[in-house]
C-alpha cells in the first residue's frame, strides 16, 4: 500500500480518458492494494509530452519512471534513443533531441509501458479492450510468421498485438506488423471491375467471369501466365495451381525477380537453424542479406545472441546500419570463392566454430552465380560436418510470407527453376493473358496482354488490369502459411470480406464451373486436406519439418565474378496493405527525412 501511495502521488487521475484503461497494470494493482483517498496535499508534478514520431503517443505526466522502455530500446531493439534526464522529481524519460524513434521495433514499448504514458498514436480513442473481438492468428508482412492477436470492431481491424511464442517472435512484433492494419480499411476492392473504353467500370460477378472464361477459351494455353503474390495462403495457391492444370498451362511463378532455388529437398529453401537456434550459434555469416528489413524478428534474435554472448558477425555485401557490430569481409562473389578455397583468414574462424550459421539472402541468389554460391557453400558445410542431424548451418532467408509454401506446392517446375522461363516469356511479351493472384510487386509494364487481377487492394496489379476480381485480405479468410523455418501455421479470419469480395478458392470454383460445369473443390475441408498432403516433410501444424537425409547431387556450378549488392527494400511500403496505410506512409516520410521532426512534427 505504501509503494502504491508513492506511485500514485504524482499520477493524474485520468483513467476515463486514458487509452490504457481496462488493460493497465497500475489500475489493476490500485484496485487490489490501493487506498481510495490520497494523503498527498502538495502540487502534483506535470511533465510536457514528448514527440516520439507517428507511432507512439506520449502523456509523460502519467510516467512512473520504471525505465522499461529505456531498457528495451537499448538492449532488445539495439537503438539506444531513449533515456532519462534530470533527477528526483525532475526526472523525465525522453528521446535525444526530441525526434522520432528510428527502430522497426519501437511499438513494443507500448506493450511494455505499465501505465498510459506511452500509447498507440493511430489507436487513440478508437475503442476499449472489452468492446473488441480478439482473434489469434499469424502475421504475413514477412516470412517470419510472428504470432499476433487481431482486435476487430465489427468489420474494422482496430489494432494488432503480439502473442508470446518463444520459438518465433518471443513477445515482440515489428512496427510494420503492428501498424499497417489501417491499410486494411483503405483502397479496398469490393466489387468486380471490367475495363471498358479504357476505364474500369463496376460489373456483376456473372459478367466478369463470363468475359474471363471467353477470353481463356480464345487463347492458346501456352500463352497464359499466372503469378502468385507475396501474401497468398497455401489453400488459395493450391486451387490456383489446380485451375492452371485444368487449363493445361505450366507458366506459373511466384518470385518477383529472378533468384536461384533448389527445390529438390526442403532444407535447401528454409531457415534450417530455426529462429530460436540463432541463440546457440557462435559465429554468423550474412551473405547478400539485410535481416533488419527482410526479417525484423530474425534480426532481433541475432541482436539478442550478440548482446548476450558477443558472437562475431560477418557479412559479404554491405547490409547498412544493423543493430549490432559486424565485419564486412567483401562485397563480391570472389570473396565467397576465397573462403571456400581456404585463401583467407576467415576460413580458420569458420572451421573453429562449433555452431556457425550462414544466412543467404535473395540478393545473393539473384546473381548469375547464385547457383554457384548456394551449392558450393552447401558442399563446403557438408564436407566440414556443419550439416548434421543436430545442426544445420545452411539457411535461406526468404522475404515473403508465401515463398516456402509455394515451393512446397511445386509451383516451380524444374524447367522453370533452371532457366526462369516465366520471366523470359514475360520480357518477350509472349503472354496474351496474365493472371495475377494477389501479385502487386512484379515489375510489370502493360503491353498488349490481357491482365486479370484477383486481390484485396487497388494497388499496382489492379492499376493495369482489364478485369478485377475482389478477394479478402489475410485477416478475412482462413488459410495456412509456412514460415521461413518450414513451420505451418494457421492464419485465422478475424473479420469478414468487404462488399461482394469472395474467397480466392471460391472464385476459381466459379470460373471452373463456367468452364467445365463442375467445382474444383467441393468444400474448404477437402481443400485444406489436399494442401496439408502437399507439404514436404510435414510434421504437424506449428511444428518444424521432419529432418531428411540429404541427397547426393552433382551440379555444374558456374562461377562469375559479380558484385553482391543487397537490394534495398522500401521497408514501410513493401506490400499492398502497407502501401495503403497512412501510418506506414508517415513512417516512410520520416525515414526519408521528408517530415519535420521534434516540436514541428
Question: What does each of the following model-derived ranges do?
Answer:
Residues 540-571, 575:
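Acidic, Ser/Thr-rich low-complexity intrinsically disordered segments
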Amino acid at each position: 500500500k505504501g509503494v502504491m501511495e508513492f506511485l500514485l502521488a504524482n499520477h493524474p487521475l485520468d483513467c476515463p480518458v486514458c487509452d490504457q484503461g481496462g488493460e493497465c497494470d497500475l489500475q489493476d494493482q490500485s484496485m487490489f492494494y490501493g487506498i481510495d483517498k490520497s494523503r498527498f496535499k502538495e502540487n502534483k508534478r506535470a511533465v510536457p509530452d514528448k514527440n516520439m514520431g507517428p507511432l507512439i503517443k506520449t502523456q509523460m505526466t502519467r510516467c512512473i519512471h520504471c525505465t522499461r522502455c529505456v531498457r528495451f530500446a537499448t538492449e532488445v531493439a539495439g537503438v539506444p534513443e531513449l533515456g532519462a534526464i534530470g533527477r528526483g522529481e525532475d526526472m523525465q524519460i525522453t528521446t535525444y533531441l526530441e525526434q522520432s524513434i528510428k527502430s522497426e521495433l519501437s511499438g513494443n514499448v507500448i506493450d511494455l509501458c505499465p501505465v498510459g504514458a506511452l500509447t498507440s498514436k493511430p489507436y487513440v480513442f478508437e475503442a476499449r479492450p472489452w468492446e473488441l473481438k480478439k482473434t489469434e492468428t499469424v502475421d504475413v508482412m514477412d516470412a517470419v510468421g510472428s504470432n499476433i492477436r487481431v482486435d476487430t470492431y465489427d468489420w474494422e481491424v482496430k489494432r494488432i498485438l503480439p502473442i508470446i511464442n518463444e520459438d518465433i517472435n518471443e513477445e515482440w512484433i515489428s512496427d510494420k506488423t503492428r501498424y499497417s492494419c489501417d491499410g486494411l480499411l483503405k483502397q479496398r476492392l469490393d466489387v468486380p471491375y471490367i475495363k471498358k473504353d479504357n476505364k474500369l467500370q463496376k460489373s456483376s460477378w456473372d459478367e466478369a467471369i463470363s468475359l474471363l472464361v471467353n477470353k481463356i477459351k480464345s487463347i492458346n494455353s501456352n500463352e497464359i501466365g499466372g503469378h502468385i503474390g507475396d501474401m497468398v495462403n497455401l489453400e488459395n495457391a493450391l486451387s490456383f495451381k489446380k485451375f492452371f492444370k485444368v487449363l493445361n498451362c505450366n507458366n506459373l511463378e511466384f518470385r518477383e525477380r529472378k533468384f536461384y532455388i533448389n527445390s529438390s529437398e526442403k532444407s535447401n529453401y528454409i531457415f534450417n537453424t530455426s529462429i530460436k537456434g540463432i541463440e546457440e550459434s557462435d559465429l554468423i555469416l550474412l551473405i547478400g542479406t539485410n535481416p533488419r528489413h527482410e526479417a525484423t524478428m530474425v534480426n532481433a534474435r541475432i541482436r539478442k545472441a550478440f548482446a548476450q554472448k558477443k558472437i562475431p558477425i560477418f557479412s559479404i555485401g554491405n547490409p547498412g546500419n544493423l543493430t549490432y557490430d559486424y565485419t564486412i569481409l567483401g562485397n563480391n562473389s570472389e570473396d565467397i570463392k576465397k573462403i571456400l578455397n581456404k585463401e583467407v583468414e576467415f576460413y580458420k574462424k569458420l572451421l573453429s566454430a562449433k555452431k556457425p550459421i550462414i544466412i543467404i539472402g535473395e540478393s545473393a541468389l539473384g546473381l548469375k552465380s547464385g547457383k554457384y554460391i548456394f551449392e558450393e557453400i552447401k558442399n563446403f558445410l557438408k564436407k566440414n560436418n556443419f550439416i548434421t542431424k543436430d545442426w544445420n548451418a545452411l539457411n535461406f532467408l526468404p522475404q515473403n510470407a508465401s515463398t516456402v509454401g509455394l515451393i512446397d506446392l511445386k509451383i516451380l517446375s524444374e524447367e522453370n527453376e533452371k532457366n526462369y522461363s516465366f520471366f523470359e516469356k514475360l520480357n518477350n511479351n509472349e503472354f496474351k493473358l496474365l493472371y495475377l493472384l494477389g501479385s502487386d510487386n512484379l515489375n510489370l509494364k502493360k503491353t498488349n496482354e490481357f491482365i486479370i487481377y484477383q486481390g484485396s487492394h487497388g494497388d499496382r496489379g489492379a492499376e493495369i488490369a482489364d478485369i478485377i476480381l475482389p478477394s479478402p485480405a489475410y485477416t478475412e479468410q482462413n488459410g495456412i502459411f509456412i514460415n521461413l523455418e518450414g513451420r505451418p501455421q494457421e492464419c485465422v479470419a478475424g473479420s469478414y470480406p468487404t462488399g461482394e469480395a469472395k474467397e480466392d478458392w471460391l472464385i476459381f470454383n466459379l470460373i471452373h464451373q463456367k468452364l467445365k460445369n463442375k467445382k474444383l473443390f467441393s468444400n474448404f475441408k477437402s481443400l485444406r486436406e489436399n494442401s496439408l498432403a502437399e507439404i514436404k516433410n510435414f510434421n504437424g501444424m506449428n511444428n518444424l519439418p521432419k529432418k531428411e537425409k540429404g541427397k547426393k547431387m552433382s551440379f555444374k556450378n558456374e562461377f562469375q565474378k559479380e558484385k553482391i549488392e543487397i537490394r534495398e527494400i522500401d521497408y514501410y511500403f513493401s506490400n499492398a496493405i502497407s502501401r495503403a496505410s497512412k501510418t506506414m506512409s508517415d513512417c516512410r516520410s520520416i525515414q526519408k527525412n521528408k517530415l519535420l521532426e521534434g516540436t514541428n512534427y
